[in-house]
Amino acid sequence: YIGFGSMTAGDMAETLDIAREAVLLSGVRAVLSTGWGGVDVPPAENLYVAGFVPHDWLFDRVSAVVHHGGAGTTAAGITAGRPTLVVPFGGDQPFWATRVKALGIGPHAIPRDRLTAPRLARALVDLTETPKYRVAARELGERLRLEQGEFIAANIIEHELRKWLREEDRAPDPVLEHNHAEPPAPAGPPD
């Protein structure tokens, strides 16, 4: 999978052309998501071009993911246990690129402003053929899935909400007290 999600910075047509050329140079098979780019990219024998595809469905069916490094896409790739290459555009994306490398689930990032087809082609081969990335990504994905993060987060939110509602029941509400108070006496005639 190669996709840059909601990224519209710079020339997305150029970015997608670089990705397409890298797939052709490397010989890997890929799904290229055009995302919000609104760009037409010609398919090839080893390249399927798609608009938006649900990551939680697709990432289970690919061998690796290449993306912009948004928190959501990074988490989806890790949860699926897939080696990851980040092409950060800006914002928090360099942070996630650093984490991917530190966790051993992918190679050094290629910042968007340094992205070339030959550089990406080499990274695609490295990403898909280096066993240590596959092993580390699979192990991390298994650990993450065992955490049941959504279930735990929902329980914490519900617990805190119940606690907050109980505190609200005990605390006086100045607005309600004001609404139930006796109206003030009318003012007398001016002196």
Predicted regions and their residues:
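A donor-sugar binding/catalytic signature common to diverse glycosyltransferases
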Residues: 50-99
